[in-house]
Amino acid sequence: MPFVPKLVLFIFWLTVSSHLLAETISGTISDPSGALIPAARIEITGTDLSQPIVLSSDSEGRFSSPDLKPGSYTLRISRDGFETLVKTLELKDKLNVRLSLAISKPRVQVEVPGKKLPYANSDPVYRSLRSVGLGTTYSVSNATFSFDTATFQFQKGTLTFLSPVNGVVTGAVFIGEGHFTLKPATALDAQELKRRISASQVEEDFTEVILRFTAEERRKFFLGIGEQVQNPAEAAAALDRWKDRVRKRHEVAQSFTEQLLQGETMDNVDADLLAAVYNPAHPPFINAYIRGSKHKDLRYFIRTRVGALPQLDSPEEVALINYDPDSMEDGVWYLDHMGAEYQKGTASDEEDRRLFGTSSYKIETVISKNDHLFSQAVINFRPLIDGERVLKFGLLPNLRVMRVLDAQGQDLYFVQEGRKEDGSFYAVLSKAGEKGKDYAITVQYEGDKVLEKAGDGSFYVRARSSWYPNLNGFGERALYDLTYKVPKRYKVISVGNLQSESVEQDFAVSHWLTPAPVAVAGFNYGQYQKLELADEVTGYKISGYYLTELPDDLHNFQALRSMAPQSMTKYALDQTRAQVQLCTHYFGKSPFDRIYITEQPNFAFGQSWPNLVYLPISAYTDSTQRWMLFGNINASFNGFVQEVTPHEVAHQWWGHAVGWASYHDQWLSEGFAEFSAGLFLQQAVAGNWRKDYIEFWDRLQKRILEKNNFGISPNDSGPIWMGLRLISPRTENAYQNVTYAKGAYVLQMLRSIMYSPDDQDKAFIAMMHDFVDSHRDKPASTESFKAVAEKHMSKIMDLSGNGKLDWFFNEWVYGTQIPRYHMEYQLIPAEAGKVKLHMTITQSEVDDHFVMLVPVFVDFGKGMARIGQVGIAGNTTRTADVLLPEKPKKVALNAYKDILER
């Protein structure tokens, strides 16, 4: 499942010694008339290249390769509407070539955008913000400025305001001596800070602060300034360094903060300020970039309404980030609501953070024969607050916007800097819309890197949620009207229901509609064959799409090549049908009546969209086939294959039927889907299910508790509720192992303590149906799930005597304690042939307030059967007696690993 990122991958590049690669191939691409051709694809292969180099010609038809060794190279140049040109060159010195592409025979017409983009980055106010310089400077001495939980002490120095833009000052530069203090607003965030820096508050001396703010925040600085003085040279240099730093995008992130702040969805600060300049009532914000004595790039943000870190989907307004990708202290140090909200009792993770709400998208996409994408998206939206003119979209920076139009067909200004810059896409309305009224804009865009060829007929879909201008990510649901035009040998499988298919010359056209609003749109693409499977129990229409050829990186697996893809697909569809039936029984109906199971050319990655699932090739193999492939069974990989299909199918409920409110609550999606995979192993697998089921929970326990090379276990990295903030250089894979594995355990433990010998899972099933039904039209939060659980709790679960499950959620969601259990028992003959079971149970390695209900099992010769559960509090030992009808073969505590323990 996407995004937010689900797995964060850090790739480190080794620098190649420059004296080994000294030559380049450059040139221009033109048509027969001499007109230059932009966006032509140039693929270079040859001397010692382990993989092709792929370039695109710029708006002037120019291209230039990186440094190459001397030798023979083949250039393959392609562009939709032209014949492909293949040319071989001998590289001895630097080469500059002029290449001409012949116009191809008539085919489906694709409009190639013009070279000039007069409305791109051309809004006059935006241009002024982009080039803003220094204004007046004032001396500052022993001035203190407080912004929520943080205090800036400007002990000695100068404060230089930036020049006004449209009459508004949007920033300042402090040079001198100062001190920064941050005191967390809550105990939970103080604990998180202590885990990171071994201190419960932040203290940092600084010599430089760059401030960017809205007009309201600027007024606070006038209370502490002295007399006007000459601008210091250091201020101009500091501003230039700041511009260079925050405007640079890193395509391959080295750290979590680099991914957030300088990655694909990075902010364009000037465009954010443009929104505030155009709307005086824009939600106020302040960004402070602190050059400290110990930490050279601390960033303190206060952003009301939209959240301090929109890239993290954060409901909190206040953040402190240590941006230092090369340091072990890199990370999000602090993220919380404003202190005033806690004082008023108004702090909430469920506030609407959107500025605009989207009702529908109509997207027409053409994929050319060289995998280039051309699209037009009509986006229907309504303003949610007054006065806003600037809309920020999520869009892959390699997809270049060519034109933005309003509903009347008039061109609109838009912002999208270069691919390697702060190239996020913003549209600028010609005037502010009226709150609650419907509006529409049309966005035309094109580019590469949405698709990557994996083999003959197979592709990786890389830009999974950013292949179209997405206004609010997973934060809202909208209707989608999707039309795809692709080379006719290929097939698109999309979210929604297929409305029609046709062929236009060499292109296949398909039209899809979502019958109800969904959070995101996606598609799979390749040379697919189709197989269908009926589900008479749920009425679900299940379709499988499989590839007939292996991707290039799996060609060495000859055993896989010999397996029948259709029968392998039938295996995956059988698993899908079983999981659909199981989830429908336990959780209720999903919002969809069909599901498309599509093979993707990846061996170890799956993902779920609304009624569309990507499965890795490995999911199509059973244990016998995996033995044929590898000659042995790797327990970890075998576990992944067992879990991936039921996990991804379960996302039709967890993530799509029920969304999540913020990064704090993503465990309700990933953890619940992981739990559903375990439920599948227990309920839907014939034969000896106990072995696979117990091994599943053993694997999860190991993922939660096993320490990494820094001696830190995922569980010790922080509570589930911290979500993506668990990511740091020292904690490594903590986010995945806590959110997925411990999240699954939380739901399993609720199931365990709700279980009764008479009704078994009846109360749990009622709770899960209620949870799904009550959250079909709104995102779920940890607290809203807790409220549903409390409606269905039994008397034995009320360990605090107040009808609440605070004790459970404080321990397992907001806390990190995990108990250790030990049991000794005696079997004592009783009257009438019965046996008294005397148990001594010890709970340890927790505090005195920790309470839990632990299940007890006995085996009378037919396998372990549950006879009840024992409540125990703190580090203590308690005894209990139970009268049994006969002598058991064995007695065990927590026999099926229902409770997480050490």
Place the predicted regions along the sequence by residue:
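Hydrophobic helix-coil surface modules that form long, contiguous segments used
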Residues: 340-345, 349-389, 394-397, 402, ...
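Amphipathic alpha-helical substructures
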Residues: 385, 690, 728-729, 734-839
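Acidic/His/Gly-enriched intrinsically disordered linker/tail segments
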Residues: 670, 674-749, 775-776
